[in-house]
Amino acid sequence: IAKGYLISRTQESISEKLSDYVVYAIDNVIHGCGALHAFEDNTAEVAAIAVAANYRKSGVGAAIVRHLVATARMRGFRMVFLLTTQALDWFYQLGFKDGTLEDLPRSKRDHYNYKRHSRILVMPLGK
């Protein structure tokens, strides 16, 4: 958060969408997390992907993203999208492609933070 890689979230904002979040834990210790937020137009955002430093490069982050994408497919979303400032190549390896502002649902597009210079990535899920 301090380096601007992640967006700061309040406890209240997380609590409001707690069911959107998944965690990777071993012995009740959380080592990674992520969220799948539903939007209009049958789309969902993969968000808040974070992995503890000692678990990076272990596949935890990829497993979380794959789980969220599989969940989106099961729930019938037509597309998932994400915004990233740092992990572009990693998300490409997971199957995401470059997107544009027009690919975002209107409510997300209307609140896009141009100051972050986030790249928009998309993954059509198909039927």
Protein language model annotation of sequence segments:
Residues 71, 75:
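Short alpha-helical functional segments enriched in proximate histidine and acidic residues
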Residues 23-25, 120-124:
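Short, well-ordered beta-strand micro-motif
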Residues 1-30:
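Active-site rim helix/loop that mediates acceptor-substrate recognition in acyltransferases
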Residues 83, 92, 97-120:
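Conserved catalytic-core motifs of GNAT/GCN5-like acyltransferases
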Residues 23, 29-38, 42-50:
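Conserved beta-strand in the GNAT
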Residues 51, 57-70, 82:
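Conserved acetyl-CoA-binding loop-helix of GNAT-fold acetyltransferases
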